[in-house]
């Protein structure tokens, strides 16, 4: 579906191009079916290769965050590019989701918990 890797027990999702109304539902279903419903509750969403993101996709991110939070897990956005970071800021999503510059920084935070 989308590029990913699992390091220790952390799922690192690495979508590319766009997250928008055309693929957000598929992305959400895939994340829930392949990871959340199988007990993974630590997920990083790497946004460095995402060229654009729309409000529908932001809603999907919030849904994933709520699910992970309710299970005591850890969710973070990693290395959003400038354009995506601007959208996160304008929508105040950067206030409710942890954002890290690198995967290593996010991994350090997970290990501390």
Swiss-Prot record:
Gene Ontology molecular function: any one: anti-sigma factor antagonist activity
Modified residues (Phosphoserine): 55
UniProt domain STAS: residue ranges: 1-110
Superkingdom, taxonomy of origin: Bacteria
The entry's keywords: Phosphoprotein
Post-translational modification: Phosphorylated on a serine residue.
PROSITE patterns named in the record: STAS (PS50801)
Phosphoprotein found in the keyword field: yes
Xref: Gene3D superfamilies: STAS domain
Pfam families, per the entry: STAS
Chain's role: In the phosphorylated form it could act as an anti-anti-sigma factor that counteracts an anti-sigma factor and thus releases a sigma factor from inhibition.
UniProt record similarity statement: Belongs to the anti-sigma-factor antagonist family.
Protein name per Swiss-Prot or TrEMBL: Putative anti-sigma factor antagonist TM_1081
Organism: Thermotoga maritima (strain ATCC 43589 / DSM 3109 / JCM 10099 / NBRC 100826 / MSB8)
Organism placement in taxonomy: Bacteria, Thermotogati, Thermotogota, Thermotogae, Thermotogales
